[in-house]
Each structure stands twice: as structure tokens, then as C-alpha cells.
Amino acid sequence: MFAFLEKEGISNLNDIDHNVVRLFLTDLYHQQLSRRSVSRKISSLRSFFRFLERENQVNKNPFMQITLPKSDKPIPEFIYMEELEKLFKVNDLSDPIGQRNQAILEILYATGMRVSECQGLLLENIDFSLNILNVQGKGRKERYIPFGHFAEEALRVYINDGRTKLLKKAHSLTNTVFLNARGNPLTARGIRLILNKMVEKAALTIHVNPHKLRHTFATHMLNEGADIRSVQELLGHENLSSTQIYTHVTKDRLKSVYMKSHPRATTDDH
């Protein structure tokens, strides 16, 4: 700010008015700063001038009426189905650890649940008669999330076989669904490490974590026609704006919609 004022020949802070601030904003954008960086600078200057005003060093705060630019919201990264299919094939389903890892992967992708929700999942939270999970979300808010055939099969195999074997190694019983090699409840960090090992086994070059699987769940649901309000409820978002970041569509989906919908996209004999 002070370098800008010197360039403009302004030495008295009381000479900074709305027009000067606008020029300063233009200068920031010419520097190709992100909206978030600009917002941060304006917010800091607003606080600084508020202090000066309180100390009677300036007559007014020229930044009070400036609306902060909305932050850039990056499009969430998601995993393509071909990459997911490779992950689904890496686990040894005859081994308790492999059964557990498969169940974690299937349930994270099937439900879009947060890693904390997966970590805290209890046996009594699973209703196999309806294939629905009762999840404790943020602020201990409950929500129900359905899951499909592949997740059901992976959970049943793990709970009936792998989990029973892991639990025998524990010093005390627990109703937590996902256990580590010693039979104790898995941590969120443990779940992330499990996914990292799966990626290594699958020889993928992408980064996979629970939140990326959550992004993938939302993206795939919306791309396949799920309405945004339903996805909002499944994800446990309070505000629709949190879900709207997933309304980007893949290039494949865009091309598919175009080819099906545009009258001159294809010839009749294709």
C-alpha cells in the first residue's frame, strides 16, 4: 500500500479516499493477484485504518465501504472411474487387513462420508436390512446414508470374518467398525495411510485421500443425474453453496450430453 501511495505522490493518509482505494485495487489486479490475496490485503488495511481512526490519526477509514471480492473457489479434484477400478482390485480379500481395506474404500466411495465419520462408525450404525448407515456428522448431527451392493458385500465379509479375527488381538472389546492390526479402533491418520498404500499397490500417480473420495462421490452422483438437494443431504452440508462446488462436469460427460442433444452433432448413420 505504501509503495503505491509513494508512486501516486500521496503522503497524507487523510488524502486516501474512495477513488484512491479504487486505484489501489486496480493496481493489485494488474499484479495478477488472486481474489483471496486481494481480500486478505483489503481486510488487513481495513483493520489498520480502524486502529488509526480509533487513535485519531486519520479522520475516516477509506476501506470501510469496500466490498471484499469473493474468494476463488477451486474446482474439487475427483478420481476417474478407471482409476477407482484399479484401487478396488488391489486388496487381498482372503486376508483380514485386505478385507478391512476393501470395506473402507467401498464405504467411503459409496457414501461420501467424512474420514471422521468413517473412523467413528459403530456396528449399531449399520442397518443391513435397508443398507443404510446412521452417521454422526459435524455438530453431532445425525443423517442417514444408503449404500449399494458392493459396499454391502465388502462390509459383510469384513465384519463377519476379518474384523472378528482382528478383534481377537485387542485387549478390550469395541463396537467401532474399523480396527487396526492390533484390534484397536483405527485413527483418521490410519485410514489415510491405508489409502496411500492402496495407491502404491495400484501403481497410480494420483493422490487419494478420504476427502478426495468424498469429492468423487459427489461429482459422480451429480454427473449421473442426482439432484443437488439430495446430494447436499447425503453429504451433510448445511448450506447448498457447499454442495454447488461439485456441479462441475467432466469432459466426458460434457461431450456425451452434447453428442446426444445437439441436432447436428452426429449424422443419422452413426
Question: Can you say where each PLM-predicted feature lies in the sequence?
Answer:
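Conserved catalytic core of the tyrosine transesterase superfamily
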Residues: 1-270
